Amino acid sequence: MAKKATLVDHGAAKGKKKAQSKVSKKNANKRLVVATNRRARHDYTILDTWEAGIQLVGTEVKSLREGKASLIDSFATIDDGEVWLRHLHIPEYSKGHWTNHSPRRTRKLLLHRNEIDSIMGKVRDGNNTLIPLSLYFSDGKLKVELALGRGKQDYDRRQDIKRRTEEREATRALGRRVKGLTG
């Protein structure tokens, strides 16, 4: 189920100071994750990551604050020196009307020029692709965790699964051994 994302404005009004509780100070810098791409780490070897802003319209932000988004099948491309996020699904805002956005429209990612140049060089090198790992709010602004990934072959996936099961079995055996000695 979708969770409702809420954020509190901690800014001070003009000339007046606003009292902050201890709870709001603790949560001021935390990430509020809206969506994650769980298949990305399974299907790709992650080589590098970046944090990018995203250009949105009002109803998209409202829909995201309700916790609704899907990163399935989404990817990023570089066209004319700009990074674009494609196939990100943000459903229409439930209380919107004729001003609602198109759910699967192409959205511009906001990065520094030197980051874009670096990404372009790495994508051109070989079988690399840009994939979003997560969408989250950071200090009230929506951010995208963008990753440079290389697609895994079937044998790579099998090796990863085998390695994880071996690690899991080793920790279980160690836990049983410790319990057997102490108990």
UniProtKB/Swiss-Prot annotation:
Its main location: cytoplasm. GO terms for molecular function: RNA binding. The keyword Cytoplasm applies. It comes from the Bacteria. One of its GO terms (biological process) is trans-translation. CDD domains: SmpB. The keyword RNA-binding applies. Keywords: Cytoplasm, RNA-binding. Residues 1-27 are annotated as: Disordered. Belongs to the SmpB family. NCBIfam families: PRK05422.1 (NF003843), smpB (TIGR00086). This is SsrA-binding protein. The gene is smpB.
